[in-house]
Amino acid sequence: ADIVMTQTPASVSEPVGGTVTIKCQTSQSIDDYLSWYQQKPGQPPKGLIYRASTLASGVPSRFRGSGSGTDFTLTISDLECADAATYYCQSTYGVGFGGGTEVVVKG
């Protein structure tokens, strides 16, 4: 059966310097085969984290991924205006993306 990715919340608004937590739940265990992506309007998705917790090259440590099995979390600390974007989780089994979380940063 296809793995269903459930991502929450759909949107979140926090001030500059704040912290955002995004959760992704899968309908069956995917071990740590989960990636997180950031997408800004008119741009392709940018990979942030792979294997649940490993930062992609050049991604600041303000971004942190955790979890395994069916429950995963992306935490963005010390929010900057440039972090305003939509964030997606994806199983690296290639079964599609979560529904996305729009992050609004209040400056």
Swiss-Prot record:
Annotated region described as Complementarity-determining-1, given as residue ranges: 25-35
Highest taxon above the source species: Eukaryota
Region annotation Framework-4: where it falls in the sequence: 97-106
Region (Framework-1) residue spans: 1-24
Region (Framework-3): 58-89
Region of interest (Complementarity-determining-3), ranges: 90-96
GO CC terms, sorted: immunoglobulin complex
Listed InterPro entries: Ig-like_dom, Ig-like_dom_sf, Ig-like_fold, Ig_sub, Ig_V-set, IgV_Light_Chain
Keyword NAD attributed: no
GO biological process: adaptive immune response
Keywords: Adaptive immunity, Immunity, Immunoglobulin
UniProt keyword annotation of Membrane present: no
Gene3D superfamilies tied to this protein: Immunoglobulins
Region (Complementarity-determining-2): 51-57
Residues covered by region (Framework-2): 36-50
PROSITE patterns: IG_LIKE
Note: The sequence of the B4-type C region is also given.
Record's protein name: Ig kappa chain V region 4135
